[in-house]
């Protein structure tokens, strides 16, 4: 876990680029290799699928990999929560990953399946010393409030997850307090302003989060490098949201807009 959550400050900046496993090509991540290359230097770890790891990450780069191993559904299917484990522990070892990631859907039709998936994955990982990150995915019918997220995070930890990724909410400190393993926050959908995403990161850390696993709010920004630098200044540099936003604005004045933004116009 020390490769995921830095022991110097017990925090992490994880870059999420696993969205294609259910969303397909997405603005900002249409060409994963291009997106990842520009941001790699500023992330503590990458969360991605084995397909993107094989095709889009330079194997010479030494960065901790959080491998998404749950899937089997898509945005056009009937129920995103009907996920299975889609990669073996042997494959994870071959790919030299640092951590395994899997979604759970507490309260959904497939709650039992995804929770037993988590238990099985923890058992698989324990045999080889590979920790597991549980993602508390939220279905359309579920509220992102502290009661629900606190329940989901606690269950994930009780099932053996070593770290939990969840959403920020009101009374988030209660969610963290009730979870005996580190909690990192998801960035979620792209917010309208970079300042909002930076405030989200800052508030979560103030309420006890151990870091962020952010994707769309970084690589869907017109200035993704400046954005990840600003996020990093909050997580590891103890900047507040205003200081981080000023750093973002300064960087965006000299950063060339991302190619995906140019292509889409």
Segments predicted by a language model, with ranges:
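N-terminal basic/disordered segments at the start of proteins
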Residues: 1-6
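C-terminal helical cap(s) of enzyme catalytic domains, especially alpha/beta-barrels
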Residues: 205, 220-259
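Catalytic grooves of carbohydrate-active enzymes
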Residues: 217
